[in-house]
A protein has these predicted regions:
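Rossmann-fold NAD(P)H-dependent dehydrogenase/reductase core
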Residues: 1-89
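Short, glycine/charged-enriched secondary-structure capping and boundary segments
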Residues: 27-30, 93-97, 150
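Glycine-rich loops and low-complexity Gly/Arg-rich segments
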Residues: 36-41, 103-107, 157-159
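Alpha-helical membrane-targeting segments
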Residues: 43-50, 85-87, 91-112
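Alpha-helical packing segments of well-folded alpha/beta enzyme cores
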Residues: 62-65, 116-120, 157
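Secondary-structure boundary/capping signal
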Residues: 77, 98-99, 131
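C-terminal helical subdomain
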Residues: 104-145, 153
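Intracellular terminal tails of multi-pass secondary transporters
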Residues: 148-159
Length: 159
């Protein structure tokens, strides 16, 4: 087949969240991944634990998927970034309105939409961006749970 010259520094940036760390103990629960989350409780719409589980799973999946892309396409630079905790309509009132919660869940403070873009812009244009890495704002290597080192979820997610 024909080869394509992709250039010296092609980058694909995936958005995730440091909240991925609160994923289920088993990691990605593939049996629960459906367009409609039928097994979630009615409390989900009220911000119950199931809505958070639904939030954390795709954030973990984005990191797992990024790792698989690095493995399959080594000539391209793939990284995942966390924008920081932003002050949006999705930010729970218990974080916005409680100083203790903000210190715990948003230690750098709530970010504006503009500030939330800085990490992605850095990953897109910055020097010393390492393929396969997960970065927290701005350009800081983020913590990786043991589930990110397991190749089985990468293969299952890809299939």
């Amino acid at each position: 087949g024909a080869s394509i010259d992709i250039g010296p520094d092609v980058r694909v940036i995936t958005s995730t969240s440091e909240g991925y760390r609160f994923h289920a103990a088993e990691g990605i629960v593939f049996k629960d991944l459906h367009p409609t989350q039928l097994n979630l409780s009615f409390l989900s719409s009220l911000g119950g634990k199931d809505s958070w589980r639904r939030y954390f799973q795709p954030k973990l999946a984005n990191l797992v998927y990024t790792a698989e892309l690095v493995y399959r396409y080594p000539a391209i630079k793939f990284v995942a970034v966390h924008p920081g905790v932003r002050d949006t309509e999705l930010t729970p009132a218990w974080i916005k309105g409680n100083a203790r919660s903000r210190r715990l869940f948003a230690p750098g403070g709530l970010k504006t939409a503009e500030e939330g873009s800085w990490n992605q812009l850095w990953a897109t244009t910055g020097n010393n961006v390492v393929s396969g890495q997960y970065y927290e704002p701005v350009g800081i290597v983020g913590y990786r749970t043991p589930k990110l080192k397991d190749e089985t979820p990468r293969e299952t997610l890809w299939d």
